[in-house]
Regions:
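Flexible glycine/proline-rich
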Residues: 1-156
Length: 156
């Protein structure tokens, strides 16, 4: 998977027990931000389907995204999808608790990276402030202030 952060990853199955029944195995990267983004973008939906919380035909393995605007700019790695932890901010750039305040007022959602260094895989302390994961496509080398991007709000 060509993304930042998030590698290496794996998925497969292994025979378990006397019956040899296949048990799914999902391998996550080792760095904290890589695990965080990989789990939210790929694994959470799969677990929801496997546990019966969501029917497979509803496509729950793909998280739902909203459109938000970047309050500030940041660089994105060339040729890789960037998954960047974000917080929602108000018009002045101050952190807001969640996107619902914007939805209730009918305004636009604005976001900013939770850490000034962006989505580096070792920035674990910043994850406590994350309220969403931004999805920057591989052809975008820099996000500019005001640019629209897909954002996956985090639940819980």
């Amino acid at each position: 998977v060509s993304q930042q952060p998030g590698g290496p990853q794996g998925v497969g199955s292994t025979a378990v027990g006397a019956s040899g029944a296949d048990t799914p195995v999902i391998c996550l990267p080792g760095n904290p931000v890589s695990v965080f983004t990989t789990f939210h973008m790929y694994v959470a939906g799969v677990l929801a389907v496997m546990s019966g919380l969501v029917a497979p035909e509803h496509g729950a393995t793909t998280p739902s995204a909203i459109t938000a605007r970047a309050r500030v700019g940041w660089d994105s790695p060339r040729g890789k999808t960037q998954f960047i932890p974000l917080c929602f901010v108000d018009e002045a750039g101050e952190r807001a608790d969640d996107v619902l305040s914007y939805d209730r007022r009918g305004g636009e959602a604005w976001v900013a990276p939770v850490h000034p260094l962006g989505s580096k895989s070792h920035l674990v302390a910043s994850l406590a402030r994350a309220r969403a994961v931004g999805v920057v496509p591989p052809e975008c080398e820099a996000v500019t202030p005001g640019q629209e991007l897909a954002v996956v709000p985090l639940v819980g």
